[in-house]
């Protein structure tokens, strides 16, 4: 069947050569999907690739080699990748990967795929077995001159009318917005393994992408706005930072409006959220400081306006608007990573900040001005709302620290002791706004020099007066200073610090927002 497809490709190219100048490149590739039933796609056939102006298109193949048995995984189109430039054959070069992958340039170049082992080894080529001539083949050769031309004309007319979006197996009749700055993950083998969390906008899966574990946040179609918002935040220049969740891709999965799922693929962190970790673990003084310092560093960077960020362009100031311990993830060394930017808002000079509804976020972590509905819709006001929530998360850390000479209680959420696990908006307004209550700071915490100073910082974060709250950058510097002063002290110095904690020089409140 190779000859008919080649002839058809030549006819199509000759008809379109005149009209294709200045337009995006097109490519035709062999298509195959081993998971076609699960992903609700065709199992095999041809895929027509359509790219953007000045972008090159390739074909690819991926497969497994289990004890000499070749298991084809996927074939199809691949977007502009310099590793594929000018490759006429599909050749995988990695040594013994779990999944082999190759890409090439040229129509149907992924029909044959090859693994070229380390130098000196034999080249192993995998090629579809030849098939005996069939009646269908004979008919194809006989009818090709007339039928092929008719088919090309019909295809050209149909494509002109429908304008299929590039790489799209899904059409949900919307403007998809700017594409995310990442390769198309949908063409790589991705397997969902287990659900790790469920939230307001869907569920989070642990998944395997090639040889790595990733997190896949799946939104139902009705929560499209949250998916789009988070994708746009991740696509903002300068969002690559050690203390911000690493973004990999955003995709639409499914084949009809009723079955579409919206996927957000990010790095996976096995320790989970800070909430989950504190529930099961008591932390040391150094662990508390490390989490607090890296968490405040991440929020400080998010809040910062960077005119020219590492050559990527202008990074605007961003308010999180749903800062809480559940949205702080932990790396293996307990470095904090901020996540869940579905409610975040950007503040770009000369542009409105977008959707800035007042009462958004998690009720328990809402600042007094949010509970009152008395928000000043300016950048600094939103950053101060984040800082109130930061104070509550720091309190959660202190409540599970064993540094103080006293009992460590079971983990509790902020205000859980005062108004339970499911407080109403009215209860929070009464406690936080009218009574101006805050989570209890235990007496024995104040007997530890470091915790005592940290409690002062916490109180300045959740101050009822929003303008008096510290900035995230100031909190980062405070925690670093406290950590160094305590860790460098001798036992005798610790005794004197306990009696003179109020005289310790903290960073001045001029560092507040």
From Swiss-Prot:
Disulfide bridge map: 29-59, 49-77, 84-103, 90-102, 104-109
Main subcellular location of this protein, as a coarse class: membrane
Cited InterPro entries: Activin_recp, Kinase-like_dom_sf, Prot_kinase_dom, Ser/Thr_kinase_AS, Snake_toxin-like_sf, TGFB_receptor
Active site (catalytic residues): 322 (proton acceptor)
The keyword Cell membrane is annotated on this UniProt entry: yes
Interaction with DYNLT1, as annotated region: 492-513
Protein name: Activin receptor type-2B
Gene name tied to this protein: Acvr2b
């Amino acid at each position: 069947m190779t000859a008919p497809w080649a002839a058809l490709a030549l006819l199509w190219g000759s008809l379109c050569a005149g009209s294709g100048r200045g337009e995006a490149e097109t490519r035709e590739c062999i298509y195959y999907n081993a998971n076609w039933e699960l992903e609700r796609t065709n199992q095999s056939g041809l895929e027509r690739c359509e790219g953007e102006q000045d972008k090159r298109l390739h074909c690819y193949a991926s497969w497994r080699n289990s004890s000499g048995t070749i298991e084809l995984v996927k074939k199809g189109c691949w977007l502009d990748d310099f590793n594929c430039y000018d490759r006429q054959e599909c050749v995988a070069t990695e040594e013994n990967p779990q999944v082999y992958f190759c890409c090439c340039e040229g129509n149907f170049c992924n029909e044959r795929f090859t693994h070229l082992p380390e130098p000196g080894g034999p080249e192993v080529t995998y090629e579809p077995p030849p098939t005996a001539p069939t009646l269908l083949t004979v008919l194809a050769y006989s009818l090709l001159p007339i039928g092929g031309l008719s088919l090309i004309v019909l295809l050209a007319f149909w494509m002109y009318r429908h304008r299929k979006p590039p790489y799209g197996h899904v059409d949900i009749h919307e403007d998809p917005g700017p594409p995310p700055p990442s390769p198309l993950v949908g063409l790589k083998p991705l397997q969902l393994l287990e659900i790790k969390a469920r939230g307001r906008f869907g569920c989070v899966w642990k998944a395997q992408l090639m040889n790595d574990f990733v997190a896949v946040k799946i939104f139902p179609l009705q929560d499209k706005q949250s998916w789009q918002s988070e994708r746009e935040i991740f696509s903002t220049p300068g969002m690559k930072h050690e203390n911000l969740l690493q973004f990999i891709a955003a995709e639409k999965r499914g084949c009809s409006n009723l079955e579409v799922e919206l996927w957000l693929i990010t790095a996976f962190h096995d320790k989970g959220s800070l909430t989950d970790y504190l529930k099961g673990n008591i932390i040391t003084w150094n662990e508390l400081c490390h989490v607090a310092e890296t968490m405040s560093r991440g929020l400080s960077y998010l809040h910062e306006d960077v005119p020219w960020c590492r050559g990527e362009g202008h990074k605007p100031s961003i308010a999180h608007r749903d800062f809480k311990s559940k949205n702080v993830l932990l790396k293996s060394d307990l470095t904090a990573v901020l996540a869940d930017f579905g409610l975040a808002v950007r503040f770009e000079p000369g542009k409105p900040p977008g959707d800035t509804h007042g009462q958004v976020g998690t009720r328990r972590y809402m600042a007094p001005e949010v509970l009152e509905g008395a928000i000043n819709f300016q950048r600094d006001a939103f950053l101060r709302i984040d800082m109130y929530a930061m104070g509550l998360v720091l309190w959660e850390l202190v409540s599970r620290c064993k540094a103080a000479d006293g009992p460590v209680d079971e983990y509790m959420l902020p205000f859980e002791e005062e108004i339970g696990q499911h407080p109403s908006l009215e209860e929070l307004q009464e406690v936080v706004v009218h009574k101006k209550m805050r989570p209890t700071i235990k007496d024995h915490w104040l007997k530890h020099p470091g915790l005592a100073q940290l409690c002062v910082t916490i109180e300045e974060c959740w101050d009822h007066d929003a303008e008096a709250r510290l900035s995230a950058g100031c909190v980062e510097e405070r925690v670093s200073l406290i950590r160094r002063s305590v860790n460098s002290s001798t036992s005798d110095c610790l005794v004197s610090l306990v009696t003179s904690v109020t005289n310790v020089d903290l960073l001045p409140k001029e560092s507040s927002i």
